[in-house]
Amino acid sequence: MSRRNAAVKRPILPDPQFNNRLATMMVARLMKHGKKSTAQRILSDAFGMIGERTGGDPVELFETAVKNATPLVEVRARRVGGATYQVPMEVRQERGTAMALRWLVNFSRARNGRSMAQKLAGELMDAANEAGSAVRKREETHKMAEANKAFAHYRY
């Protein structure tokens, strides 16, 4: 671990097309091999499809989807006297949002067929409606934390 000062956290600028910080974060998670314009086009196309299907504001639906997929608690492994315990811990807001975006992208990629934009649009709409794999993953994470509540005193 570095002995120098902690790195200064750079502010995330809002996406130029949607004027939204979450959209910028999503583009970064969608991007593969530095192809940012491709990732931006995928997000833009997905938002277009969401707008067509719902008739509402796609950015609002996107924010709702991220909020619904964001975990509040997670379990982390902690070794105590030769045994490894799954210790439930609260998730900071930035980490929770990052996890939600990562899950949304990963589960979109895992969906069947069609273009990435269609898969992403489907996953976002499902998440906004409290359904979909990303929301199921959040519920699973919360259940794990609830089941291991007895080890909460091992928090670090």
UniProtKB/Swiss-Prot annotation:
Q: Which UniProt keywords apply?
A: Ribonucleoprotein, Ribosomal protein, RNA-binding, rRNA-binding, tRNA-binding
Q: Which GO terms describe its molecular function?
A: rRNA binding; structural constituent of ribosome; tRNA binding
CDD domains annotated for this entry?
A: uS7_Bacteria
- Subunit structure and binding partners: Part of the 30S ribosomal subunit. Contacts proteins S9 and S11.
Which NCBIfam families did the record assign? Answer: rpsG_bact
Family that this chain belongs to:
Belongs to the universal ribosomal protein uS7 family.
Q: What is this protein called?
A: Small ribosomal subunit protein uS7
